[in-house]
Amino acid sequence: MHGFDHVYVSKDSGIFKFNKRSEFAGLPISIQSQKLAASASMFDRESINVKIFVAPAHSLDHSTLQALKKVTRIRIISDGLLPFPYKREGFGWLPNQLNEAETKDKGVWTFNYHPETCSDEAFMQLKRFIENHHTEFTPLNKLRYHPYRFEQMLTEKYLIYKRCFYEYIKSIWHGAKIYVPVYHKP
C-alpha cells in the first residue's frame, strides 16, 4: 500500500526526515486512520492481500504506525536506513534507500521505481538487473528480522542527522552568493 490519495497535506517529514511533505506525518491519528482504512478497503474489494506499507515521500510518523495497526493487517514497512530488516514498534522494517537497482556487498535492500518518472532505459536496466540477480531476491516469508536495539537506534539516528547536515550544507552552499574579488588595473 502506497498511501491513499498521495496528496501532500503536511510539511512534517516524519520519522526519517527525508522530505518536508507528507500525506500522513503530522496529521491526527483519526485522519490517518480514515485514509488508511479507505485505502485498505479498495484492496479488500479487489481481493488483494496487502502486506507492505510504503509511505509516500518516505514520511510517516508514530501515529501512522498506530493507525496501520488499528485499521489494516499490514505489519511490514518498506523504509528505514539500516542495512538489514529489523523489528520495531510491532512492524518488520525493510530498508529502502535505493532509487535504482544496484548490487550491495551485504544487507537486505529494497529499491523503488516511480513509473511516471522513469525512462524506458531505467526499466530496461531494472529488467537486466532482475535477469542477472534473480537468485539473490528473497521472498517476504523468508526474511529474518533483526532486533531493534540501542545500537541500531544510534546508527539510524546518526544516518538521519548526517543526511540532514549534508542537506543543510548543500542548501547554504547553493543559496550563497560567492563574491570573488578581482583586481583590475585601469
Which positions does each model-derived feature cover?
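Terminal accessory/targeting
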Residues: D5-H6, S10-I52, A57-P186
